[in-house]
Amino acid sequence: DIGSTIRCPYHRWGYGTDGRLVSAPLFDSVPREDFDRGDWGLVPVRVETWGPVVFACLDERTPPLGEWLGDLADRMSGYGLEEWRPIALTASPHDGDASAAATSTSTCTFDVAANWKLVAENFAEYYHLGWVHPQLAKVSRVKDHYRYQGPGMYCGQTTTPVSGDQRDDWLTLPPASGLDHSDATSGRFVTLFPNVLLSVLPNHVFVVLLEAVTAGRTIEHCAFLFPPGPATDPVPPAAVVRAFEVTRRFWIEVNDEDIDICERAQRGLSRGGVPPGPLAPRFEEPVNRFHKMVADLMTLESMTDLSVPPGDRPGTADRYGTALNPAPPHVEASAPESG
């Protein structure tokens, strides 16, 4: 069955979906007694999933995904992200609104002339928010930012409440059902080490996967995800299509602003001669957490020695100037206070 065979494009060796080598064209024209197909199957790769992301790992010594995520899966369990989908939205011809009949894509890629770590660090901090992202700052206001990180290989922040303010177009998108008060009123912004950037809103998610190409080049693979409901119907309502298009353009505008500032920073770093500046504790502590993860993985002799970082302690001990969240996620609301 050719349809169930994985073919190498070079010499056309064929593999079954279980990884076994099933054909090696012309290889036996000169027989070899030391050749056993059973020895030459595809290399097994660890694959696990969480939410909308598939994770592949080439190092068997790396901790399992559940340990890597720490409490992140529990933190975001209320969203039911495993059911959210990236789709192409097309307005119904029966909406009576021809202007909404265009198709919008929910995936896109960007070529960034900057190191992947710089892109991730930029996402992890909000010190630049008011100056680089004037429109985003109307929805995700600096004064409403709080830390959002427990044990796990991630760093994060939340905007609570996330506000329509002067940009309420996205509110037309139907929210996920069953959200608690904290999830329903917040925006979560998580850097899952090393290369997954998540912007999680009550009614949509913007996912960015960073592909490190060279020391000065990164490809961003982006997708918009939607919860089950009108946005994922085969023919969604015209109002939803319009809201998605406005939301898509908004996030691409924000991402373009990030790309510009990261590329400018990359040019400065590449020239050398300027020492790095201090981190602003309130706004950039997640960057310090990210730096420690990079340093750990650069200096460990083996992944078996990796220690997944703990989270912020409850109370104010680790807040570095950030106030307590008025509507904390359930994993923080249920934690005991400490000083």
Model segments located where?
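C-terminal catalytic domain of Rieske-type non-heme iron oxygenases
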Residues: R46-E48, V53-G339
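Rieske [2Fe-2S] iron-sulfur-binding domain
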Residues: D1-E60, G66-D74
